[in-house]
Amino acid sequence: MIKVRVPATSANMGPGFDSIGMAVTLYNEFAFKEINTGLKFNGIPEEFCNEDNIIYEAMKYCFDKADYKFKGLEISVLKQDIPISRGLGSSSSCIVGGLIGANEILGGKFSKDELLEMAVEIEGHPDNVAPALFGGIVVAIIENNKTVYNKIDIKNKVKFITIVPDFRLSTEKARQVLPKQISRADGIYNIGRAALMISCFLTDRYDLIRSACNDALHQNYRKELIPHFDDVYNKCYELGALGCYLSGAGPTIMAIIDNGAESFSNNIKQYLKDKDIKWRVLELQADNKGAVLIKGDC
């Protein structure tokens, strides 16, 4: 039995729309086994127990690349801590998990870079699948139909308070509210801040991260789909967040805080309770390892 752990990811970091993503310490875990015949699912809702399952599709994609005719597959979800359609890379975790599982069945035929290309071909963009595979912050672009990326390990000087709403927001719906064209001013606004964000993490200049988190390409449009967004976002800064941004396509809000700030989580939880906003608050660290094989029992 092959077991794989894949981290949640926070894409569209601040101004890094479709290009900067980060892995955090929240996980889905999967198990895979080739069987004599058929397709068997464990720990998966009945409606997804078919050949349209995204995990199965990723595995088959990998097998097809290797021209490998598998007999049958048993696919198990051992842990599903990454919430679905919340802007934390749940679908990417399934794609990456399936590709790694298939590659292990193939005896490790493909490199991680080759698995990344497959993941991007399936997902359509690299900003979730790349950090899910490699961990840390990953800056990734598509150049001549190839993924070009660079990974940055995140030091433990900051942690990430992940504020998860009690409703789903599909990426498709969140895409529909975006403008088809942007102004030169908005493009320049984001380019400068994306560069600043990366430099902040490289040089520990977290005092600058607030300016670096600002965005003109997607957050102001998508926040209209998220009740209480402005109130919670502004409260995070009031309580001392170093930076704050909409994670992925939303609706999750990610707050970056100093690793020694002990009271922030309790204070934002109390604020949500007082306002009767039934959102979850998770205190996470950066995951610099990315997807890994699990040894022994899960």
From Swiss-Prot:
Its EC number is 2.7.1.39. One of its GO terms (biological process) is threonine biosynthetic process. Disulfide bonds: none annotated. It catalyses: L-homoserine + ATP = O-phospho-L-homoserine + ADP + H(+). Pathway: Amino-acid biosynthesis; L-threonine biosynthesis; L-threonine from L-aspartate: step 4/5. Catalyzes the ATP-dependent phosphorylation of L-homoserine to L-homoserine phosphate. This is Homoserine kinase. It comes from Clostridium botulinum (strain Alaska E43 / Type E3). The lineage of its organism: Bacteria, Bacillati, Bacillota, Clostridia, Eubacteriales. The gene is thrB.
